[in-house]
C-alpha cells in the first residue's frame, strides 16, 4: 500500500544514509546561518544560480507547515485569502496555521484531491462580480499540493490551465510538494 501522509514519517533511502555518514564528522555552524555551515552555503549558491539572482537572501525553514505559513502570510495582503482544495494540506492538516496568520483558506470542491482551473476561475469571477466584495475576503493566491493528499498528480495541461487562470487574475500559484 502506498501512503502519502508525510514524507518525513517513513524510512530514508539507503543512499541518503550513505551521504549522511560520509559527512557525519564535518563540523558546521549551529543556531545561526553563519559562514561555517558549508552545506547550507553551497545550497544557497545553487539556489541563487538557479534563480539567476546572485545576491538573493536565501533562508531555510525546518518544516512544511512553517514554510507554508511564512510564504502564504508574506505573499497575501491582510484582507486576502488563499484558494485551496477542500482536502488540501493547508485546509486539513496544518492545525489552522494559515488562519492563525489572519488569512482565510477559501476551500473549493476537488476531484481526487485536484482543483480545476474552471473552479478557480469561478471563485474569482464570483468575487469580482459581487457588489459587496469590499466586505469579503479577496482571493489572493491559489494553493495546490503536488502530489495531492490522495496521491494524484496534476498533469502538465492541468498545471498550465491553473497557471493561466492565476496570471489572468494577477495572483500567484503556490505549489506545495
Give, region by region, the residue ranges found by the protein language model:
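Buried hydrophobic positions in well-ordered alpha/beta secondary-structure cores of metabolic enzymes
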Residues: 4, 47, 67, 98, ...
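Conserved N-terminal alpha-helix of the aminotransferase class I/II PLP-enzyme fold
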Residues: 13-64, 86-91, 97
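PLP-dependent aminotransferase-class I/II
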Residues: 102-149, 153-161
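Conserved core of the PLP fold type I
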Residues: 55-76, 106-113
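Catalytic PLP-binding core of fold-type I/II PLP enzymes
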Residues: 154-177
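Conserved PLP-anchoring active-site segment centered on the Schiff-base-forming lysine
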Residues: 74-92, 121
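Hydrophobic beta-strand scaffold residues
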Residues: 82, 105-106, 173-175
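N-terminal amphipathic/basic leader segments beginning at the initiator methionine
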Residues: 1-19
